[in-house]
């Protein structure tokens, strides 16, 4: 799973020259990414080794002066972002043997979401499961692209066959060609385009901003906005809105299954009990039957109201489910949404211990495996968070299921994490975290166990 946080940057690359006076702040890295803290809000700075020798970027900020920290696996630097005035620093790319010259400034930010009092009143305390109309539209377009031929699109349903039968004649439409070209350039475009579609709704044949959200992905602009006219034309010519209406009962059935059998509200209550410093006024789970595996999350706050979004694939029941106990099937199906929702709770807590985690996980060679999915978690903080992510699954299972079901679920989870995903020490980590949880003092929460599990990791 590739997980990106809310201050992910969309960079504009520019050449520039300037007079260099004194030593510039410098951060060194052997990896392809860094961690950014903009006013203490963390985000991933990916693609370091693909950057040109010089580039600029402007962050959207509320304040004229904002602290920025840039952290690698080796060291860190801090600069001040100012509206219209660049802060200059260097990144030494040890893997490439060169240096990137960087100029970062800031500008007044447009809020990603606005929650007026009426919205707060209507949504306070709610957990909503949604298949939005424009959201499904962009996923239909994804299914028609070259990227759609991969496992990123779930194909084992009659619904997928209906999508292809209806929309394949429009595979040559400019909207499909344009989105296909973006995904060919980089699959990293996929999640922001999908997520940002939730900011829109249909008004007749027009696709317009819903009003609550300017953007629902991690960047400072809505990545889908330039392509809205193409999507409007595609929807009109393909009669997409008729297709969506004709399948409303199917969507409603999936949503009902989610509500009755996945029980996101229970997950939210458990997470709030275990991470009492983190609270969300509402939770929205957005999905489509077309997503094969890609998951992502984001959070928003305005006017004293906070909202967590989880973008997930639907947990379809496997072919052999009827041969398994119902409790085992339920546990397996819960994992998809829980491992995305819990990032909104465990990550803010991990940020409080970033320095200790950097020391404990300074040598990742024994924690992740080259050539397996774990290799994508190649900085200490993201590695620890992914271990905790699935460790929390074990803790939740221990509270919800009987001993036999729990043992089966735990064994399967650990096998998958170690053998399939390549997290070498997950069994040890999982056992230690479970032991700490089961032996915690009265009133202690999972958040209180962070120092102990980090100290355990430091001794490995």
Regions found by a protein language model. Name each.
Residues 214-217, 253-261, 323-325, 332, ...:
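Second-shell loop/turn segments in exported
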Residues 211-213, 298-331:
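Active-site scaffold of zinc-dependent metalloenzymes
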Residues 53-60, 66-68, 251-309:
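Auxiliary, metal-adjacent structural segments of Zn-dependent hydrolase domains
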Residues 329-355:
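Active-site recognition of the HExxH zinc-binding catalytic motif
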Residues 1-23:
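Bacterial Sec-dependent N-terminal signal peptides
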Residues 22-36, 54, 59, 84-85, ...:
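Pan-zinc metallopeptidase signature
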Residues 20-239:
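N-terminal low-structure segments adjacent to metalloprotease catalytic domains
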Residues 348-374:
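Post-HEXXH active-site segment of zinc metalloproteases
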């Amino acid at each position: 799973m590739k997980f990106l946080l809310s201050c992910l940057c969309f960079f504009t690359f520019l050449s520039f020259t300037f007079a260099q006076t004194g030593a510039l702040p410098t951060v060194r890295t052997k990896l392809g990414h860094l961690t950014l803290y903009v006013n203490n809000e963390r985000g991933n700075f990916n693609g370091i080794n693909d950057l040109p020798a010089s580039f600029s970027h402007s962050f959207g900020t509320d304040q004229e002066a904002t602290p920025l920290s840039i952290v690698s696996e080796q060291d860190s630097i801090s600069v001040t972002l100012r509206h219209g005035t660049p802060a200059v620093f260097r990144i030494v790319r040890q893997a490439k043997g060169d240096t990137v010259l960087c100029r970062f400034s800031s500008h007044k930010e447009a809020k990603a979401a606005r929650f007026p009092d009426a919205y707060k009143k209507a949504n306070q305390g709610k957990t909503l499961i949604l298949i939005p109309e424009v959201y499904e539209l962009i996923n239909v377009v994804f299914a028609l692209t070259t990227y759609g031929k991969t496992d990123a699109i779930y194909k084992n349903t009659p619904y997928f066959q209906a999508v292809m039968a209806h929309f394949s004649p429009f595979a040559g439409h400019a909207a499909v060609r344009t989105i296909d070209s973006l995904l060919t350039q980089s699959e990293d475009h996929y999640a922001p385009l999908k997520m940002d579609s939730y900011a829109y709704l249909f008004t007749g044949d027009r696709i317009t901003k819903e009003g609550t959200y300017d953007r629902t992905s991690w960047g400072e602009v809505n990545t889908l906005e330039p392509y809205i006219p193409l999507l409007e034309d595609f929807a009109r010519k393909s009669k997409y809105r008729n297709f969506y209406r004709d399948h409303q009962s199917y969507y409603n059935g999936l949503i009902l299954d989610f509500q009755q059998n996945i029980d996101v509200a229970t997950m939210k209550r458990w997470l709030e009990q275990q991470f009492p410093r983190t609270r969300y006024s509402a939770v929205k789970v957005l999905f489509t039957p077309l997503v094969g595996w890609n998951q992502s999350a984001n959070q928003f706050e305005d006017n004293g109201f906070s909202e967590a979004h989880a973008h997930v694939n639907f947990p379809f029941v496997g072919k052999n489910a009827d041969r398994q106990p119902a409790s085992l099937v339920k546990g397996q199906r819960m994992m998809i949404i829980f491992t995305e929702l819990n990032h909104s709770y465990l990550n803010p807590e991990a940020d409080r211990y970033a320095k200790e985690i950097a020391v404990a996980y300074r040598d990742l060679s024994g924690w992740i495996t080259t050539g397996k999915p774990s290799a994508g978690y190649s900085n200490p903080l993201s590695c620890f968070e992914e271990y905790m992510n699935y460790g929390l699954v074990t803790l939740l299972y221990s509270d919800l299921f009987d001993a036999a079901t729990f043992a089966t679920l735990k064994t399967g989870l650990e096998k998958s994490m170690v053998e399939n995903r390549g997290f070498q020490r997950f069994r040890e980590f999982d056992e230690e975290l479970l032991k700490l949880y089961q032996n915690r003092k009265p009133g202690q929460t999972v958040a209180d166990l962070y120092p102990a599990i980090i100290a355990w990791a430091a001794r490995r």
